[in-house]
Regions:
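Mixed-charge (Asp/Glu-Lys/Arg
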Residues: 1-34, 40-145
Length: 145
């Protein structure tokens, strides 16, 4: 079983690699205490990216889920932090089994704690989660060249 830290490192490396493949300049904030993991220069501005990694894919439901929060433990108390547009501009999401890289804009996902991504896309608006068409959030569809 991989540690959470290792899984996160795999996701950060995959998202970084995707930006580099697309010719997007990427900067890495120093230290481990920043809200963003990467800063990428695209669409005319520097964008703060918080990377989230999912290492599961539900074959029966054809989807994967990814947490859009961070959690810390201080003095035996568990704290969960929701990100806002003051913290980041995008979630860079990587799913290990499918090798899918997505960019989720914070404006559309700041109120969510978990994103459920159906793959391939199915409209599930009548179900218990909002339909998210993964194709809308592929790097190629977010980054203007």
């Amino acid at each position: 079983m991989d540690s959470y830290k290792r899984i996160g490192n795999i996701g950060e490396a995959a998202i970084l690699n995707k930006f580099v493949e697309m010719g997007v300049p990427v900067y890495i904030p120093f230290g481990d205490n920043e809200k963003s993991d990467l800063v990428a220069d695209f669409n005319g501005k520097l964008n703060r990216i918080q990377v989230k990694t999912s290492n599961h894919f539900d074959d029966k439901k054809n989807n994967f889920k990814v947490s859009l929060t961070s959690s810390t433990i201080r003095n035996k108390n568990h704290y969960r932090h929701k990100y806002s547009k003051e913290d980041i501009d995008y979630f860079g999401v990587y799913n290990i089994p499918t090798k899918m890289c997505l960019l989720l804009p914070i404006e559309k996902f700041s109120m969510k704690t978990i994103a459920t991504i159906p793959f391939p896309y199915e409209d599930k608006t009548h179900n218990q989660y909002e339909a998210i068409n993964y194709a809308d959030y592929l790097f190629e569809n977010i980054i203007n060249k």
